Every structure is written in structure tokens, then in C-alpha cells.
Amino acid sequence: TSHNAGGHIHIGASILGEDVEAWRCFLKLYTAYENVLFRFIYGDKINGRKEMFKYAPPSADLIYNGMSGINKAKSISDIKWNLQTNERYAALNFCNVYFKDPGYIYGKNTLEFRSPNATTNEVIWQNNINTFAKMLLSSRDKVMDEDFLDYKLSHEYLPYLGNEYLYNNVNLKNALEFVDLVFDNNVDKIYFLRQYLKNFQENYGIETVVKAKKFIK
């Protein structure tokens, strides 16, 4: 693929539907672990493409800034008004969500996850789709501890600017927390961690997209 190519994944917002608690859990999960997700969705590269911040910049700060209102939300409309729903070029994009009826399944009603990179490797696509889908499903099924996510956000959250290293370096503690929150089997956890760790290759000071050493069969 071109070193300037990105990859977008659309998943039906109907998974969360009109369940305010499910939306709240998903938004907290994404915000708390966006830095882990970025290194993961670099895919078979160890860093993001040059145009990443134009076409797929981090979204966590935007969501975090509206979290007080999200915590008070009583309806999907309340959720919507605390999100930046017009930010089409964001890593997590809400522009295609049909907030008037988020359970709608007969047309375009999707959450868009915009990957910094593209790939022709089908295993990477499978890992990415599986991860984003399982994030939504685990949020819908309330299998995660929302109080734990609140703690993460109130005690550990750092904005992107000034802390860019969090989106590049390996943070094994956060990665292990994430897989335990999202996946219900060890196979999914292993595939995620392999793609996230990339044999612990670092990308400090690298300005061009670099292919990772082979970490999948």
C-alpha cells in the first residue's frame, strides 16, 4: 500500500442502539485506551503515515472534554450534544451515526474508525475489525467495570499534546488492562498483543512509515 494510505472501518452503531449506559461505557473505554489503540492500528507498520494528523487525528481529547456532560446524559440526544459529531477527519468519527434512531439497521448508521495506515495484510484487517467490534459488544453487554474506567480517566488520563509518546511506546500495563476488558478469550488477546507489541520495536525519531518486523505467520 502507499505510505500515504489510510484504512477506515465502519461498524453499525445499532450495536449500542439507544442504550445510554452502553454508549457511556464505550466512550470511556475508547478515551482511556486510545493511546493503546493507535499503536495497535499502525498495523504492520511501527508508526503512522505522514498525513495521519490531517485525516485521522486522535479523538480522545475531544471526547474527554465532553465527559462531564456524557456522565449526566439521560438520552442519546444528550450523548450527541456532548460529542463533536461534525469532525469527519477524526480517529473515531460520529458523522455517520443516525442519532435520531441509533438502533436503525436499514441504512447508513455507523461508527467510523479511521486507521492511520492501510495494509494489504488480511490478518491485520481481521484483527482491527475484531477489536473494534468487540469494544462495542463488551460495552453493550456491560461486562466491564465502569468505575474502573472512571478511575483511569480521573487519575491517569493525559492529553495527546505533550504526551505523544503514549501513542507510540509500548505500555504493557495498559495493553493488558485493555485486552482483559474487551476480549473474552485468550486467542483474541494474543492476536491483539502481537500486533500491539510488534516485537517491542520503537519508532522514536522515525519520520517515515516503517514496516514492522514480521510478527504474524
Language-model regions, residue ranges each:
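C-terminal accessory/tail domains of diverse enzymes
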Residues: 14-217
